[in-house]
Amino acid sequence: MEVLWYLTGPDGRYPWRADGARKLSYAYFQQLARAVDHLGYTGALLATGSHDAWIQGASLIPYTEHFQHLIAAHPPLLSPTLLAKMIATFDQFSKGRLRVNIVNGDAKLMAQYGVHLSHDERYAYTDEYLTVLSALLRGETVNFRGRHIHVVDAGVPLPTVQRPHVPLWFAGSSPAAYEVAAKHIDTYLSWGETPEQAETKVRAIKALAANHGRAGKISFGIRLYVIVRETEAEAWAAAQDIYDHMDEKAIIGAQAYVAGIDSIGQQRMSALHGGRKPKDLRELEIAPNLWAGIGLVRHGPGTALVGSAKQVLARIQDYRDAGHEVLIVSGMPLLEEAYRFAELVLPHLPVDRRAEAGVTSSFTKDRDAAWQKIA
């Protein structure tokens, strides 16, 4: 399987608070990327945030060796021809270490960039966009006239390192999103709903993909926060500390922002906690070790796996049993929790940890023997 970390701010122990947020710098991102690379993760997601994900990712190529960059791209903000050229250039310079996360966004975010399309119009746009982009990445010369996109003799002179093309990833919870994923996407991502809810998506998209002649062509991933400690009690104590720092102002602000978003995925995340902060944080444990409290102060994915290493591994197995072989995880703060997850959980997952090639055999033997005690 593949396990990716996260490389986008804000960051800190309580990043929704001024006194809990970490100052981000290029040097810090270098440090974080090197850590992710060395610790044996597959790579990391560079999502939409304060920094431009493409410039950030390109600047980190020289500081990593195995790190796969999963970089977000919003179709309405770049022509498909320009994005294809960016992808080919990045793939060549990184020697094949790129995946592209196609992000449909929401009306509120897109309006900030001057794009005013309804929910279904955005997916219709993305459908046309990916038709053109995929052909360009295959090396074709493209002439296409659609409702939203019209290109004439479009082509990219640079071949990609990865064949037949750089992998395209995608997330979305509406019927329109499912259709786009089924037609075009290599890896479909879900935010951290319960394994049962996530499996329902897997089945729906597999059925649609088969209708498009793409049976078996799509892999599936899940995006989660993680709060893992050596014992369950320690993990829930850490979650309690995070919960105690969720002040009313932060919750009201976050919930006011997501209330106006037309993203179905965001609406499904918000429904898990209902915008309320009960006295007992365990009331937001929506499934074993799956806690929805993060969504009170963060938009986007808002659930965390909370527990001991053994419990977190069991819950990851639940998602694998539901058809997910890609895991994107993060913790707060990003750097410290990347090390913690790599120590407690990552060695027990079937990940190709190529970055460990230079580690001495005595170290790995001692480490593996130690981990057998908690497996």
Name the predicted role of every residue range.
Residues 1-66, 145, 161-166:
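N-terminal beta1-alpha1-beta2 module of alpha/beta enzyme domains
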Residues 1-10, 115, 119-161, 195-320, ...:
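An alpha-helical appendage that flanks or caps ligand/catalytic pockets
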Residues 41-63, 192-196, 328-342:
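Glycine-rich, proline-tolerant flexible connector loops at the mouths of alpha/beta enzymes
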Residues 76-92:
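Glycine-rich anion/phosphate-binding loops
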